[in-house]
Amino acid sequence: MHCGSRLAASLLGCGLILSVNSFADAQPAAGLDQHIETTTTELLGEEEAARYRRIVPTDKTISWEIYLPGNDSSEAPGVFVYISPRASGKIISPWREVMDRENLIYIGANKSGNRIHTNRRMVFATLAIKALATRYLFDARKMIVSGFSGGGRVASLVASQYPEVFQGAVYICGANFWKENQTRDVERVLQNRFVFLTGTQDFNLLEMRRTYEHYLEAGAKNSMLLVVPGMSHDLPDADYLTKAIDYLMEGAPP
């Protein structure tokens, strides 16, 4: 089996969908920033980690920044995997209220910015699910991948190569159309939901619009272009991120 297929199968076993009582009893205190450090060997075992050694050395420490949603929900949260163009994966302050309201765990890898090779960034983003599963409970039916600028381009690769893992994606000021020779299941991609979030002053606006239109032409009908008035090449505020996530959640199970 292809490494990507093996990893996808492994990730699909991570999500835990729990009853109200078991979730309330098991989940740690929320509304907090957390930090995870581990290696591919610890997450995958020696044999599986060896398959990725050319991308990530088996003894290399990988770290992620996490925000656990602070709310009174009795339901297991979904997951929002963020790929930053910068070295830090930490959530920006205005987005905490979005994660609280949408009941999503935020996780972003450190040392996964634009200077890092794309394959490594993709592995860090997908392994985020495994890392979370060792510590927290979440609903695997509500998984979103997102990224900004170059991170948005990487998120678009992750979304197209792991459509069975991530049911939705928010591409912020950067996205690529999928390559069919790298996408195992285009039909599954077309079932998912996508938001192309950009601004009227973003230098990538035209490219984002073209990629969005390419998605529609390919049959990804559940796609939305969200253009923020006055926004340049930047992260959206809480209101616009909420609009994007609300659109994705329209297709999520209750």
PLM region descriptions:
Residues 9-19:
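Bacterial N-terminal signal peptides
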Residues 23-78, 211-213, 223, 253-254:
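A domain-start/cap signature at the N-terminus of enzymes
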Residues 84-88:
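Active-site glycine-rich loops that stabilize anionic/oxyanionic intermediates
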Residues 141-190:
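Primarily recognizes the serine-hydrolase "nucleophile elbow" in alpha/beta-hydrolase
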